[in-house]
Structures are given as structure tokens and as C-alpha cells.
């Protein structure tokens, strides 16, 4: 782990798709850690995956070098590959349909312009400690919106 890079593990969870969902992010920098989580009563897994990354980037107080770990190919490819074409087509897909979750994609696109971001895809539920922590936080977000006790 490089000490001058903020490492972010982000994950989303959904009980039903759509259904109640949660997002979680674990930030680590120079021995300091921060946990973020939340949720929505009616959402989708993709919205929660995007929200996790957005909330993590919003928590940064200044321009930073950031390494974001996600198990969502949708988020990773969306922001590194697809977003450029979407913007060129005024937020339409290649078959001229509106991009889903455009509100979140626009927010994420704006936030990544403010930082130096490296995107790393990790396999979900495969024992990666950071990803497991983000997953637990996302599930905490689900529990919170469902009124379950959050520990």
C-alpha cells in the first residue's frame, strides 16, 4: 500500500433488484481509516455500487491520488471506458437509449475530474479484506434502512 495514495474499497448490496439496498466504502490513508455507509429503501444494486464510490470521493477534502477497488464491472468499465462515448452522445447509449443511472454517472464523472484516480477491479466475495469490509458496510446500510439494529 502506497502511503501517498488514498485507497478506497467500495461496494453495494441490494435485497431484491430493485429493493432495499445499501452502499459501503472503506477509505485508508497513511494508517488512518474511515468507514462510510448508507442505504435506500427502493434502489438497485448498480445504483448502490455507484453511490458507494461517489460518497467516498465526496468525503475527500482536497485533490488526491486515489486507488478505488470495486467488484463492479459496471462501475469500473462505465467510468473508464463507456462514459466518454455516453458524453459524446449527450448521455445516450450506442443504441440511442438514455443511459441508466445518468444522475449518478454525471456525479461520478465530475468527481473523478477532481482527483487522480486509478481503478482496480477485484473479485467479490473472494477473501479480499478491503472488499469484504466494504461489503459488510453495504449490508450495514441495508440493515439501517430496514430498521434493523446496526452494530
Swiss-Prot record:
Domain RNase H type-1, first and last residues per copy: 2-143
An annotated Gene Ontology molecular function: magnesium ion binding
EC number(s) given by UniProt: 3.1.26.4
Binding site for Mg(2+) 1: 11, 49, 71
Binding-site positions, Mg(2+) 2: 11, 135
Cofactor note: Binds 1 Mg(2+) ion per subunit. May bind a second metal ion at a regulatory site, or after substrate binding.
GO cellular component terms listed in the entry, alphabetical order: cytoplasm
Reactions that this protein is recorded to catalyse: Endonucleolytic cleavage to 5'-phosphomonoester
Pfam families (UniProt xref): RNase_H
Main location: cytoplasm
Compartments reported by the entry: Cytoplasm
Key words of the record: Cytoplasm, Endonuclease, Hydrolase, Magnesium, Metal-binding, Nuclease
Enzyme class: hydrolase
Known cofactor(s): Mg(2+)
Subunit structure and binding partners: Monomer.
Family of this protein: Belongs to the RNase H family.
Protein's name according to its UniProt entry: Ribonuclease H
The encoding gene: rnhA
